[in-house]
Amino acid sequence: MKLKILHFTSGNKLHIDNILKKLKSKLSEFEYQFYISLMEYDENASRTDMKVFYVPNIFVANWIKSNHLESIIDAFEEESNNGVRPEIHIKVKEKKENVKSLKNNKSMLYFNTNGLSLNPFYTFENFVVGKSNEYAYTIAKLVLQQQASAYNPVLLYGKSGLGKTHLLNAIGNDVKEKNKNVLYVTSEDFLNDYMDKIKRKTMDSFRDKYRKCDYLLIDDVQFFGGKEGIQEELLHTFNTLHNSQKQIVMTSDKPPKEIKGLEERLRTRFEWGAMAEITNPELETKIAIIKSKCEVNRIVLENEVIDYIASNIYGNIRQIEGILSTINAHINLSPESSSLKIAKNVLKNYQIEKLEGITLDNIIKVVSKELNIKPSEIVSKERNRKVTFARRAVIYLAHSLMINSMNIIAKELGMKDHSSVSKALKAIKKEIAENSTTRNIIEDMKSKIQQSLDSV
């Protein structure tokens, strides 16, 4: 892929190509293909000390700003010996064109009258990529390039609300433009359709529908567990499509081996191709998601508020839109109030779900594993730097994630009283505020604690 250049001369093109080669040599294939190659350089808007780039959406912009800005600066300086300041802007499409395309292209809204309607807003362009979903995103993109290759079937799995359905729709949105016959259904719809055709004695039409498509996209296949009759029909459908070199993509809230009541023959077929897990998003990804939701919904929040929200939501990212809408409503009703204070009050309503099931033992196990120390050291009287940091991390996480009072935390950790816990909490909060490395370590442990509960 080439870095696109707007308004270039032959000399400038060579200059940009050299910079592109430098970037490609320093970055992974994934980073280059899905981020750097999407940049468009605008020569007319650029100056010697400032270079203007356009990218297709806010997600790419945020990712490049967070991860690759220094690499771009270094590449320009190596090429021209001049200091530069890159400006990353989002390329805006004409609204009339968007409206026209929706009116004139019914497949934008419906890609198969025999299946579910495709959500036109679930695309690869507005899917926020992070460490938690990078592999799943890559596999989904590769399906478009190498249909019926090693990536068949594809199974995307992870708990609800993390983006599996978004990726499934993104695949459908993409391939529908290539005049492929795409069928997207939930497993429950597949079952209901099966039962209806049996009742009507029209199973031939059922088989024609599901076995003659180019892409079969099935959401929530864990629903098939324990349903023997439909599993037999799905097995034959699977075999027919696979033998015909047709692509199958599925989602599940768990890997095949954990789906109770799933026949062994079907389980092995689910595992034939590529399986990709989507886990809870890390802090940077949550921040990018919140910023994108704010932009789409025209919600203006300070970075301090966005950071607070990202640091205090766990698991299901589907909550984010509801949280942002509630915060925005409160801000509009009380414009004189602090946005951060409003955000804190709103998030209290989401704490019950977050707190359920978390124990101090969960937290100590995760912290001790991540920091490579023994759990017994955390509850001991030792005061060396490593143990002190681990103990403070446990206190901070317990205070953030649990209902327990300071006195209970002090007792469990063998500390004198709540004042000792308060002092340790104040110290770790200060370190988190001043040290981004500490903050990232703590946030990573928060995610691991949530994941440890999800796996139970």
UniProtKB/Swiss-Prot annotation:
<dbReference type="InterPro" id="IPR038454">
    <property type="entry name" value="DnaA_N_sf"/>
</dbReference>
<feature type="region of interest" description="Domain II">
    <location>
        <begin position="83"/>
        <end position="116"/>
    </location>
</feature>
<feature type="binding site">
    <location>
        <position position="161"/>
    </location>
    <ligand>
        <name>ATP</name>
    </ligand>
</feature>
<dbReference type="GO" id="GO:0006270">
    <property type="term" value="P:DNA replication initiation"/>
</dbReference>
<dbReference type="InterPro" id="IPR003593">
    <property type="entry name" value="AAA+_ATPase"/>
</dbReference>
<comment type="subunit">
    <text>Oligomerizes as a right-handed, spiral filament on DNA at oriC.</text>
</comment>
<dbReference type="GO" id="GO:0005737">
    <property type="term" value="C:cytoplasm"/>
</dbReference>
<dbReference type="InterPro" id="IPR001957">
    <property type="entry name" value="Chromosome_initiator_DnaA"/>
</dbReference>
<feature type="binding site">
    <location>
        <position position="163"/>
    </location>
    <ligand>
        <name>ATP</name>
    </ligand>
</feature>
<keyword id="KW-0235">DNA replication</keyword>
<feature type="binding site">
    <location>
        <position position="165"/>
    </location>
    <ligand>
        <name>ATP</name>
    </ligand>
</feature>
<dbReference type="InterPro" id="IPR018312">
    <property type="entry name" value="Chromosome_initiator_DnaA_CS"/>
</dbReference>
<keyword id="KW-0963">Cytoplasm</keyword>
<dbReference type="InterPro" id="IPR013317">
    <property type="entry name" value="DnaA_dom"/>
</dbReference>
<dbReference type="InterPro" id="IPR013159">
    <property type="entry name" value="DnaA_C"/>
</dbReference>
<keyword id="KW-0067">ATP-binding</keyword>
<dbReference type="GO" id="GO:0006275">
    <property type="term" value="P:regulation of DNA replication"/>
</dbReference>
<dbReference type="GO" id="GO:0016887">
    <property type="term" value="F:ATP hydrolysis activity"/>
</dbReference>
<dbReference type="GO" id="GO:0005886">
    <property type="term" value="C:plasma membrane"/>
</dbReference>
<comment type="function">
    <text>Plays an essential role in the initiation and regulation of chromosomal replication. ATP-DnaA binds to the origin of replication (oriC) to initiate formation of the DNA replication initiation complex once per cell cycle. Binds the DnaA box (a 9 base pair repeat at the origin) and separates the double-stranded (ds)DNA. Forms a right-handed helical filament on oriC DNA; dsDNA binds to the exterior of the filament while single-stranded (ss)DNA is stabiized in the filament's interior.</text>
</comment>
<keyword id="KW-0547">Nucleotide-binding</keyword>
<dbReference type="GO" id="GO:0005524">
    <property type="term" value="F:ATP binding"/>
</dbReference>
<dbReference type="InterPro" id="IPR010921">
    <property type="entry name" value="Trp_repressor/repl_initiator"/>
</dbReference>
<dbReference type="GO" id="GO:0008289">
    <property type="term" value="F:lipid binding"/>
</dbReference>
<dbReference type="Pfam" id="PF08299">
    <property type="entry name" value="Bac_DnaA_C"/>
</dbReference>
<feature type="binding site">
    <location>
        <position position="164"/>
    </location>
    <ligand>
        <name>ATP</name>
    </ligand>
</feature>
<feature type="region of interest" description="Domain IV, binds dsDNA">
    <location>
        <begin position="332"/>
        <end position="456"/>
    </location>
</feature>
<protein>
    <recommendedName>
        <fullName>Chromosomal replication initiator protein DnaA</fullName>
    </recommendedName>
</protein>
<keyword id="KW-0238">DNA-binding</keyword>
<dbReference type="Pfam" id="PF00308">
    <property type="entry name" value="Bac_DnaA"/>
</dbReference>
<dbReference type="Pfam" id="PF11638">
    <property type="entry name" value="DnaA_N"/>
</dbReference>
<dbReference type="GO" id="GO:0003688">
    <property type="term" value="F:DNA replication origin binding"/>
</dbReference>
<feature type="region of interest" description="Domain III, AAA+ region">
    <location>
        <begin position="117"/>
        <end position="331"/>
    </location>
</feature>
<comment type="similarity">
    <text>Belongs to the DnaA family.</text>
</comment>
<keyword id="KW-0446">Lipid-binding</keyword>
<dbReference type="InterPro" id="IPR027417">
    <property type="entry name" value="P-loop_NTPase"/>
</dbReference>
<feature type="region of interest" description="Domain I, interacts with DnaA modulators">
    <location>
        <begin position="1"/>
        <end position="83"/>
    </location>
</feature>
<dbReference type="InterPro" id="IPR024633">
    <property type="entry name" value="DnaA_N_dom"/>
</dbReference>
<dbReference type="InterPro" id="IPR020591">
    <property type="entry name" value="Chromosome_initiator_DnaA-like"/>
</dbReference>
